[in-house]
Amino acid sequence: EVNYSFNDNLNLAVRYSVDYYQDNRLDYRPPGSASEGNNGQYIEDRYSNKLSQLNMFLTGGLDINSNIGLNYTLGYQQFESDYRRLSAFEAVFTNPDQEFLNPGNAASQNSLPSGFRELRRQNGVYGVLNFDIGENLLVELTGRGETFSTMPNAGIIFYPSASIGYKLTDLINLDALTFLKVRASYGEVGVAPPAYI
């Protein structure tokens, strides 16, 4: 993460992260074993997944006039997921010796190699505007536009939201009441489809 302040009212933050894992699995059943693979069975799976994410956003604030203040956030987000799987299944070994414990030790009709890859990318820009009006009224407006690699012809998908809140504590003068606020919100959200449906 890198942070930079242009001045007291404008700041930039950049965050980048990568998460990677690999999972290798091997299942071997020698010929003559007490299982369904009694003529020998070899199963190997190799899984890997890399998740990377970039976030950049500007935050700031200003006073529009003596009664209205504004705080804002403008940002960009990029997400990528790269999932891979390689698999091999073999049965009825050609050579039962364990020295030949690898793919290629079975006739083609008893060998089933397979591979799969899913690559997904997502890009989005967003903005949040928070208005403080007077001492009791708060208005928040947000918007987010996204593109998805799983929807290449959809263009930019936009999600708006808005909320308004009012502090009633000053209007209701009760010693037993320390804080009372009402809030109403509206928002739209969406989820991208999987890569293959």
Model-derived features with residue positions:
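Short, glycine-/polar-rich solvent-exposed loops and beta-turns at beta-strand/coil boundaries
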Residues: 156, 175-178
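Membrane-proximal, glycine/serine-rich, low-complexity loop/turn segments characteristic
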Residues: 1-3, 7, 67-71, 192-197
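Outer-membrane beta-barrel channel domains
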Residues: 61-75
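Transmembrane beta-strands of outer-membrane beta-barrel proteins
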Residues: 12-14, 70-74, 139-141, 160, ...
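Feature marks short, surface-exposed loop/turn motifs that line or immediately flank catalytic pockets
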Residues: 20-22, 80-82, 147, 190-192
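Surface-exposed loop/turn segments flanking beta-strands in extracellular/periplasmic regions
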Residues: 26-42, 84-113, 197
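Surface-exposed extracellular loop regions of Gram-negative outer-membrane beta-barrel proteins
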Residues: 1-63, 120-151, 155-170, 180-197
